[in-house]
Amino acid sequence: MKVLANFEDNHKIPTNSGIDNLLDGGVEKGTVTQIFGPPGSGKSNISLVLAVNVAKQGKKVVYVDTEGGISINRIKQIAGEDFPKIVNNIIVFEPTSFLEQNENLKTIELWIRKHHDDVDLCVLDSAVALYRVDDMKSSRLNKELGKQMGILAKIARNYDVAVVLTNQIYSSFDDDNKDVVKAVGGTILQYWSKTIIQLERNDEFNKRVATLKRHRSIGEGKQATFKIVERGII
Protein backbone atom coordinates (compact mmCIF):
# COMPACT_ATOMS: atom_id res chain seq x y z
CA MET A 1 0.00 0.00 0.00
CA LYS A 2 1.21 3.51 -0.86
CA VAL A 3 -0.07 6.97 -0.11
CA LEU A 4 -0.55 9.38 -2.98
CA ALA A 5 2.41 11.52 -1.87
CA ASN A 6 4.74 8.69 -2.86
CA PHE A 7 3.88 9.31 -6.52
CA GLU A 8 5.16 12.88 -6.69
CA ASP A 9 8.29 14.13 -8.50
CA ASN A 10 10.65 12.20 -6.21
CA HIS A 11 9.33 9.20 -8.12
CA LYS A 12 11.32 10.32 -11.18
CA ILE A 13 15.03 10.42 -12.00
CA PRO A 14 16.18 13.49 -13.96
CA THR A 15 18.49 13.49 -16.97
CA ASN A 16 19.35 17.22 -16.71
CA SER A 17 18.26 17.66 -20.33
CA GLY A 18 15.28 18.25 -22.59
CA ILE A 19 14.29 14.64 -22.00
CA ASP A 20 13.01 15.72 -18.59
CA ASN A 21 10.50 17.98 -20.37
CA LEU A 22 9.56 15.07 -22.60
CA LEU A 23 8.84 12.87 -19.56
CA ASP A 24 7.41 15.57 -17.27
CA GLY A 25 10.34 15.40 -14.87
CA GLY A 26 12.46 12.40 -15.74
CA VAL A 27 12.52 8.61 -15.93
CA GLU A 28 9.85 7.07 -13.77
CA LYS A 29 10.54 4.59 -10.99
CA GLY A 30 8.44 1.45 -10.85
CA THR A 31 8.32 1.01 -14.64
CA VAL A 32 10.43 -0.22 -17.55
CA THR A 33 11.66 2.47 -19.95
CA GLN A 34 13.04 1.45 -23.35
CA ILE A 35 15.36 3.80 -25.26
CA PHE A 36 16.14 2.76 -28.83
CA GLY A 37 18.07 4.33 -31.66
CA PRO A 38 21.10 4.05 -33.95
CA PRO A 39 24.72 3.97 -32.72
CA GLY A 40 25.86 7.33 -31.37
CA SER A 41 22.35 8.61 -30.73
CA GLY A 42 22.87 8.97 -26.98
CA LYS A 43 21.42 5.78 -25.47
CA SER A 44 24.40 4.99 -23.26
CA ASN A 45 25.00 8.64 -22.41
CA ILE A 46 21.46 8.96 -21.08
CA SER A 47 21.91 5.74 -19.10
CA LEU A 48 25.18 6.92 -17.56
CA VAL A 49 23.75 10.33 -16.65
CA LEU A 50 20.85 8.61 -14.90
CA ALA A 51 23.27 6.31 -13.09
CA VAL A 52 25.45 9.18 -11.89
CA ASN A 53 22.44 11.22 -10.75
CA VAL A 54 21.13 8.31 -8.69
CA ALA A 55 24.56 7.52 -7.25
CA LYS A 56 25.05 11.15 -6.22
CA GLN A 57 21.97 10.81 -4.01
CA GLY A 58 23.59 7.91 -2.17
CA LYS A 59 21.41 5.29 -3.86
CA LYS A 60 22.62 2.15 -5.60
CA VAL A 61 22.60 1.53 -9.36
CA VAL A 62 22.88 -1.86 -11.05
CA TYR A 63 24.33 -1.43 -14.55
CA VAL A 64 24.43 -4.39 -16.95
CA ASP A 65 26.87 -3.64 -19.79
CA THR A 66 26.44 -6.21 -22.55
CA GLU A 67 28.60 -4.45 -25.14
CA GLY A 68 31.74 -3.88 -23.07
CA GLY A 69 31.37 -0.18 -23.72
CA ILE A 70 31.02 1.30 -20.26
CA SER A 71 33.68 3.99 -19.91
CA ILE A 72 35.13 4.96 -16.54
CA ASN A 73 36.51 8.13 -18.13
CA ARG A 74 33.03 9.05 -19.36
CA ILE A 75 31.59 8.50 -15.89
CA LYS A 76 34.35 10.70 -14.46
CA GLN A 77 33.43 13.46 -16.93
CA ILE A 78 29.76 13.28 -15.99
CA ALA A 79 30.30 13.01 -12.25
CA GLY A 80 33.06 15.62 -12.05
CA GLU A 81 34.23 16.26 -8.50
CA ASP A 82 31.58 13.85 -7.18
CA PHE A 83 33.24 10.84 -8.81
CA PRO A 84 34.95 9.58 -5.61
CA LYS A 85 31.57 9.70 -3.83
CA ILE A 86 29.74 7.56 -6.37
CA VAL A 87 32.17 4.77 -7.26
CA ASN A 88 30.79 2.40 -4.63
CA ASN A 89 27.19 3.08 -5.61
CA ILE A 90 27.35 1.77 -9.20
CA ILE A 91 27.49 -2.03 -9.49
CA VAL A 92 28.46 -3.31 -12.94
CA PHE A 93 27.75 -6.67 -14.57
CA GLU A 94 29.44 -7.55 -17.89
CA PRO A 95 27.90 -10.70 -19.40
CA THR A 96 29.51 -12.07 -22.54
CA SER A 97 26.70 -14.37 -23.70
CA PHE A 98 22.93 -14.24 -23.74
CA LEU A 99 22.71 -17.10 -21.25
CA GLU A 100 25.11 -15.31 -18.92
CA GLN A 101 22.95 -12.20 -19.26
CA ASN A 102 20.00 -14.35 -18.20
CA GLU A 103 21.84 -15.62 -15.12
CA ASN A 104 23.03 -12.12 -14.23
CA LEU A 105 19.46 -10.81 -14.22
CA LYS A 106 18.36 -13.62 -11.91
CA THR A 107 21.22 -12.77 -9.55
CA ILE A 108 20.36 -9.07 -9.72
CA GLU A 109 16.70 -9.70 -8.85
CA LEU A 110 17.70 -11.69 -5.77
CA TRP A 111 20.19 -9.01 -4.69
CA ILE A 112 17.72 -6.16 -5.18
CA ARG A 113 15.10 -8.12 -3.25
CA LYS A 114 17.41 -7.94 -0.22
CA HIS A 115 18.59 -4.35 -0.78
CA HIS A 116 15.62 -2.72 -2.53
CA ASP A 117 15.48 0.21 -0.11
CA ASP A 118 18.94 1.22 -1.34
CA VAL A 119 18.42 0.71 -5.09
CA ASP A 120 16.75 3.25 -7.39
CA LEU A 121 17.96 2.26 -10.87
CA CYS A 122 18.70 -0.84 -12.95
CA VAL A 123 20.11 -0.39 -16.47
CA LEU A 124 20.42 -3.03 -19.20
CA ASP A 125 22.66 -1.54 -21.91
CA SER A 126 21.82 -3.04 -24.31
CA ALA A 127 19.03 -5.59 -24.04
CA VAL A 128 19.69 -7.26 -27.38
CA ALA A 129 23.41 -7.03 -28.21
CA LEU A 130 24.05 -10.61 -27.05
CA TYR A 131 20.64 -11.77 -28.25
CA ARG A 132 21.63 -10.87 -31.81
CA VAL A 133 24.91 -12.81 -31.77
CA ASP A 134 23.85 -15.91 -29.85
CA ASP A 135 23.74 -19.26 -31.64
CA MET A 136 20.46 -20.41 -30.10
CA LYS A 137 17.42 -20.90 -32.31
CA SER A 138 15.24 -17.82 -32.60
CA SER A 139 12.28 -19.45 -30.83
CA ARG A 140 14.39 -20.24 -27.78
CA LEU A 141 16.03 -16.81 -27.90
CA ASN A 142 12.64 -15.12 -27.91
CA LYS A 143 11.48 -17.26 -25.00
CA GLU A 144 14.57 -16.37 -22.97
CA LEU A 145 14.24 -12.68 -23.88
CA GLY A 146 10.66 -12.74 -22.63
CA LYS A 147 11.80 -14.28 -19.35
CA GLN A 148 14.46 -11.60 -18.94
CA MET A 149 11.97 -8.82 -19.55
CA GLY A 150 9.68 -10.44 -16.99
CA ILE A 151 12.48 -10.30 -14.42
CA LEU A 152 13.11 -6.63 -15.16
CA ALA A 153 9.41 -5.81 -14.92
CA LYS A 154 9.30 -7.59 -11.56
CA ILE A 155 12.27 -5.56 -10.32
CA ALA A 156 10.57 -2.34 -11.40
CA ARG A 157 7.13 -3.13 -10.02
CA ASN A 158 7.93 -5.01 -6.81
CA TYR A 159 10.88 -2.91 -5.63
CA ASP A 160 9.96 0.52 -7.04
CA VAL A 161 13.10 0.67 -9.18
CA ALA A 162 13.47 2.58 -12.44
CA VAL A 163 14.46 0.02 -15.08
CA VAL A 164 16.05 1.42 -18.24
CA LEU A 165 16.93 -0.77 -21.19
CA THR A 166 18.61 0.42 -24.35
CA ASN A 167 17.84 -1.16 -27.68
CA GLN A 168 19.17 -1.23 -31.23
CA ILE A 169 17.34 -0.70 -34.51
CA TYR A 170 16.94 -2.34 -37.89
CA SER A 171 15.33 -1.30 -41.16
CA SER A 172 12.47 -3.06 -42.90
CA PHE A 173 9.98 -2.27 -45.63
CA ASP A 174 6.30 -1.62 -44.94
CA ASP A 175 3.33 -2.45 -47.16
CA ASP A 176 4.05 0.63 -49.29
CA ASN A 177 7.65 -0.49 -49.80
CA LYS A 178 8.93 2.35 -47.63
CA ASP A 179 11.99 1.93 -45.45
CA VAL A 180 10.86 1.84 -41.80
CA VAL A 181 13.10 1.92 -38.72
CA LYS A 182 12.08 -0.55 -36.01
CA ALA A 183 13.41 -1.57 -32.62
CA VAL A 184 15.04 -4.99 -32.29
CA GLY A 185 13.14 -7.46 -30.12
CA GLY A 186 9.80 -6.70 -31.71
CA THR A 187 6.67 -7.21 -29.68
CA ILE A 188 8.55 -8.78 -26.76
CA LEU A 189 10.33 -5.61 -25.67
CA GLN A 190 7.36 -3.49 -26.71
CA TYR A 191 5.03 -5.49 -24.47
CA TRP A 192 7.13 -5.08 -21.33
CA SER A 193 8.12 -1.43 -21.86
CA LYS A 194 5.69 1.06 -20.33
CA THR A 195 7.68 4.01 -21.73
CA ILE A 196 9.40 3.91 -25.13
CA ILE A 197 11.67 6.65 -26.48
CA GLN A 198 13.14 6.72 -29.97
CA LEU A 199 16.40 8.62 -30.51
CA GLU A 200 17.62 10.07 -33.79
CA ARG A 201 20.75 11.98 -34.75
CA ASN A 202 20.64 15.47 -36.21
CA ASP A 203 24.28 15.91 -37.17
CA GLU A 204 23.62 19.18 -38.98
CA PHE A 205 22.87 20.91 -35.68
CA ASN A 206 24.90 18.52 -33.50
CA LYS A 207 21.74 17.52 -31.65
CA ARG A 208 19.76 14.42 -30.84
CA VAL A 209 15.99 14.19 -31.20
CA ALA A 210 13.99 12.14 -28.69
CA THR A 211 10.46 11.12 -29.66
CA LEU A 212 8.02 9.58 -27.21
CA LYS A 213 6.56 6.42 -28.76
CA ARG A 214 4.69 5.19 -25.69
CA HIS A 215 3.80 6.53 -22.24
CA ARG A 216 0.93 5.78 -19.91
CA SER A 217 0.05 9.44 -19.27
CA ILE A 218 1.78 11.53 -21.98
CA GLY A 219 0.72 11.70 -25.61
CA GLU A 220 2.66 9.75 -28.22
CA GLY A 221 4.73 11.83 -30.63
CA LYS A 222 5.95 14.45 -28.16
CA GLN A 223 9.54 15.45 -28.96
CA ALA A 224 12.55 17.01 -27.29
CA THR A 225 16.12 17.75 -28.36
CA PHE A 226 19.35 17.40 -26.43
CA LYS A 227 23.09 17.64 -26.92
CA ILE A 228 25.86 15.35 -25.75
CA VAL A 229 28.48 17.39 -23.90
CA GLU A 230 31.48 16.68 -21.68
CA ARG A 231 29.44 16.79 -18.47
CA GLY A 232 26.69 14.56 -19.83
CA ILE A 233 23.69 15.77 -21.81
CA ILE A 234 21.86 19.10 -21.91
Curated annotation (Swiss-Prot):
It comes from the Archaea. SMART domains: AAA (SM00382). Keywords: ATP-binding, DNA damage, DNA recombination, DNA-binding, Nucleotide-binding. CDD domains: archRadB. GO terms for biological process: DNA recombination; DNA repair. GO terms for molecular function: ATP binding; ATP hydrolysis activity; ATP-dependent DNA damage sensor activity; damaged DNA binding. InterPro entries: AAA+_ATPase, DNA_recomb/repair_Rad51_C, DNA_repair_and_recomb_RadB, P-loop_NTPase, RecA_ATP-bd. The keyword ATP-binding applies. Belongs to the eukaryotic RecA-like protein family. RadB subfamily. PANTHER family: DNA REPAIR AND RECOMBINATION PROTEIN RADB, RECA/RAD51/RADA DNA STRAND-PAIRING FAMILY MEMBER. Involved in DNA repair and in homologous recombination. May regulate the cleavage reactions of the branch-structured DNA. Has a very weak ATPase activity that is not stimulated by DNA. Binds DNA but does not promote DNA strands exchange. This is DNA repair and recombination protein RadB. The gene is radB.
